[in-house]
From Swiss-Prot:
Entry's family note: Belongs to the UPF0216 family.
Annotated source species: Methanopyrus kandleri (strain AV19 / DSM 6324 / JCM 9639 / NBRC 100938)
Protein name (Swiss-Prot/TrEMBL): UPF0216 protein MK1676
HAMAP family hit by this protein: UPF0216
Database matches in InterPro entries: UPF0216
Amino acid sequence: MRDESRLDKYVIKEILRINRHLPRRRKTLEELLREERPHVVNRDGTKHYFDRDELERLADILPRYLHGRLKLPILIELGYSGAAVIRGKAEVRVVCEVLGEEWRFSQDRVELNMLDVRKLRREFPTATQYMFSTEYIMGRPKVERRG
């Protein structure tokens, strides 16, 4: 049991290291549209710049009252299951619109297959980023080992 816990901690630490490219703080679409050179600062100190055309397309997709709620970049969580997850009401609404899927007001999470992820990334390469998730480690059921 101890070795398993130590391994989990090591894997989580490595995943966090891999995620250094993610922003320290995501900005809203509203904030980014006001910037001359829209960007966020990443955890590793580099800057991630957004394509203004992508931001304007996102602004066209979402009602204006949600511009202050859509946090960018949209994070595509990749985990153990093979599916990708998008979280956040405004983020999910955008993704559903782009993919032609039905969106429900209460929906704040959507799972995507890799074909959908590819389509989303192709349409919004600077407004989306991959994030490697530790959820599968912390959420997996513990298996008791015998002998």
